[in-house]
């Protein structure tokens, strides 16, 4: 059975996922130090839910594609697949035995 996250762990998990989105940086703004670090915050919730549900890669890829469509930008399928693989590996390695 999954262990319930402490509040500090939940914040850490959220921050780490936000950092992954910032690293992916589909808009290309994270090179600007004055740009807010929460640019991709609204995409973390749906991403986290899919990760918690152990969604298939394709479902996560579809979500990232729709998020990028919403932003009005695109990314290569390979870039999206690498990003999804990285998110899933991070979650499985560190957080898969936990729950909110």
Language-model regions: role of each:
Residues 1-100:
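Charged, amphipathic alpha-helical regulatory modules used
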């Amino acid at each position: 059975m999954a262990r319930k996250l402490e509040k500090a762990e939940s914040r850490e998990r959220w921050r780490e996922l936000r950092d992954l989105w910032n690293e992916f940086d589909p808009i290309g703004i994270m090179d600007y130090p004055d740009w807010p670090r929460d640019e991709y915050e609204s995409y973390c919730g749906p991403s986290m839910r899919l990760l918690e549900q152990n969604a298939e890669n394709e479902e996560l890829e579809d979500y990232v594609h729709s998020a990028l469509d919403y932003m009005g930008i695109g990314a290569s399928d390979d870039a999206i697949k690498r990003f999804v693989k990285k998110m899933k590996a991070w979650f499985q390695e560190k957080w898969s035995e936990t729950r909110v």
